[in-house]
């Protein structure tokens, strides 16, 4: 039986990935303008979130799924920076929380590493 930490990671990433397919336009808004094909990036990142979320449930692939999620968290970090630097484009979200997401990303990376990647 997977640990509570693994189950929480799986639920969080799988739900976030599914959300990319339910509300793709919302996620496309946070893609920095210098990146091409925002909708494609939303669908690709959503698929990887789902794959990683499910993958951490299986001990045989947990290590690789964890590293995939860490790489994904690093890959989407520019979107978090874009949001923090352009709060006027995200007026429904408190500005302080846009900045709080930046260090939170590293907390998530540490969580994934400890739960799924550590030997």
Predicted ranges, named:
Residues 1-119:
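Membrane-interface extramembranous regions
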